[in-house]
Structures are given as structure tokens and as C-alpha cells.
């Protein structure tokens, strides 16, 4: 019996060793792939394309107990989604960057759908940094959001940083049914510490009950229309952001327009919504202004 036990133990040890070797080989392969991708020689580029294409998808639905489930949570390449502990009956998803980027020529997209009565919070684990790549093509980052009647979405990612030499176009389209609730924060930082910004174009389009609620576009950096850094636009500031809050109760009482800080203001929109626009010298000061505005609206 002792001999059989020893043989089985040796076989198990060999099996564990084989599994460890397989895991090490897989990890090495994944690491090599990521390093090649960062050098501009990844699998997608090797097939003759100019960048990496990836689409992440989230769908939230209310369950029988009144909580929120996620029947769709699809990561793709550099866009990794992770469910984390949420607030109350809301689900919470974090977007984790599994690779650097977007780089030149990349095509990233995030699609989010919130069903009737569902509540979803979406954030990110770190800032997104647009970087130059070997490909000189423009990179794109598209966000598509759909919130049904009675659904609620809090979209609160970290900042987007436009690094020197990068070229990125961001397009966000939000479609809200009547009775939907939304908190949407967008923050952009022009250049890392001590460097000039890259080229950044960003458009935000929001429809409420199929009618335009907000449609605005900003362009900054090399190649942007003249005056983007002048006193009528950024005035030398390097962090810009906005907070859009849509709530059905605003139909009865819409917050009054007011100045929140020297370079920040709250503006009621033609619908049950308010827009907070802010400029700041850095990302930390910008976040403080937007957080304070949201706290006042939540209070």
C-alpha cells in the first residue's frame, strides 16, 4: 500500500509540475504578445492592420428580487471588465486596461445597455492614456449607452489623458428613454506633467426620449481650430470636464444656474437635466469641483 501511495504521489507531483509548466508557458506567451503589441508588432498589426480593434459590452437587467444582474459582461483584448461590489441593489462594473493605449490606429468601443428598473455604476481602475504609436493613423474610442425607462446609470470613469504626440477622436452617444436617470462624468487632461498635449477631439451627443438634449464637441492640441487655448476657450487650463445629470424630478424643480467656482458653472438644460462645465489647472482640482457639484445635486 505504501508503495502504491508513493507512486500515486509521484504521479500527482508530475501532473502538478506539468500544469505549472503549461501555466508558465501561457503566461509567457501572453506577456510576449502584450509586449509585441506595445512595440507596434502585435498580432493584429502583423495581419496588416494599423491598430487593435476591441469592443467591450455590458447589459444590465433587473432581477425578480429588485436587484440588478449582468447577463452580458464581455471583455475584449485591452478592454477588460470586472464586476465589483456595488451600492445597494445597483451593479458595479470596473473597466480595467489590460494593455497600454489607445495607440495610433486603435479602435476601441464600449457598449452599455441598462434595462427598465436596472441600476448600474460604471467606473475605471485607472486613467486612460492616449499614446502615440508606430502607426500614424488616428485612434478612435467610441462609447454607446442606452438606458431604458426607469433605468439608472452612473458613468464615472477616471480621466482621459492626451499624451504628447497622440491623436485620438472620442465619440460618446447616449440614448435615454423618458424616465431614465443618468449621471455622466467626463474629464480630459491635456498632456502629462511637463509636456504638451496630443491632438484630441471629443463629441458628446445625448438624446432624451429621441430628442436632442445635448450635443457638443471640443477639439484641442495640434491641428485644432485656432483659439482653442485662448481666453474664450481653455484660457491656458490643462484639465477640462463636465458632469451631466438627468433626473425625472427635475421636471418639477430644475436647479437654478449658478457659478460653482472661478472656472466652473452649473447650467440647466431644456429637459430634466443640468450640465456642470469646469476648467482647472490639473486633474485633482477638476475632480474636486465636479465631486462637489455632484454632492450638492445628490443632497
PLM regions and their residue ranges:
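Short, structured patches in soluble enzyme cores that scaffold and shape functional sites
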Residues: 114-116, 124-126, 147-149, 157-159, ...
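Long, intrinsically disordered low-complexity tandem-repeat segments
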Residues: 15-43
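N-terminal intrinsically disordered, cationic/polar leader segments
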Residues: 2-10, 51-76, 148-151, 155, ...
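A structural signal for small-residue-enriched, beta-sheet-centric alpha/beta enzyme cores
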Residues: 186-299
Amino acid at each position: 500500500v505504501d508503495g502504491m501511495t508513493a507512486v500515486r504521489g509521484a504521479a500527482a507531483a508530475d501532473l502538478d509540475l506539468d500544469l505549472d509548466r503549461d501555466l508558465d508557458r501561457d503566461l509567457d506567451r501572453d506577456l510576449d504578445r502584450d509586449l509585441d503589441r506595445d512595440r507596434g508588432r502585435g498580432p493584429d498589426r502583423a495581419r496588416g492592420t494599423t491598430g487593435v480593434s476591441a469592443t467591450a459590452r455590458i447589459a444590465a437587467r433587473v432581477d425578480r428580487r429588485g436587484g440588478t444582474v449582468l447577463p452580458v459582461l464581455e471583455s475584449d483584448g485591452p478592454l477588460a471588465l470586472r464586476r465589483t461590489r456595488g451600492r445597494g441593489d445597483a451593479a458595479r462594473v470596473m473597466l480595467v486596461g489590460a494593455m497600454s493605449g489607445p495607440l495610433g490606429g486603435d479602435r476601441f468601443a464600449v457598449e452599455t445597455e441598462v434595462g427598465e428598473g436596472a441600476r448600474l455604476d460604471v467606473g475605471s481602475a485607472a486613467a486612460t492614456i492616449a499614446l502615440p504609436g508606430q502607426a500614424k493613423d488616428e485612434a478612435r474610442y467610441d462609447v454607446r449607452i442606452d438606458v431604458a425607462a426607469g433605468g439608472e446609470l452612473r458613468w464615472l470613469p477616471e480621466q482621459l489623458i492626451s499624451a504628447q504626440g497622440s491623436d485620438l477622436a472620442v465619440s460618446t452617444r447616449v440614448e435615454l428613454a423618458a424616465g431614465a436617470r443618468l449621471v455622466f462624468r467626463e474629464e480630459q487632461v491635456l498632456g502629462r506633467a511637463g509636456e504638451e498635449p496630443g491632438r484630441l477631439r471629443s463629441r458628446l451627443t445625448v438624446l432624451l426620449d429621441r430628442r436632442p438634449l445635448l450635443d457638443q464637441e471640443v477639439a484641442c492640441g495640434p491641428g485644432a481650430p485656432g483659439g482653442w487655448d485662448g481666453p474664450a476657450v481653455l484660457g491656458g487650463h490643462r484639465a477640462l470636464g463636465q458632469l451631466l445629470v438627468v433626473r425625472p424630478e427635475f421636471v418639477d424643480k430644475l436647479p437654478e444656474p449658478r457659478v460653482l467656482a472661478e472656472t466652473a458653472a452649473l447650467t440647466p438644460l431644456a429637459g430634466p437635466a443640468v450640465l456642470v462645465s469646469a476648467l482647472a489647472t490639473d486633474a485633482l482640482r477638476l475632480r474636486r469641483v465636479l465631486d462637489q457639484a455632484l454632492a450638492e445635486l445628490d443632497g
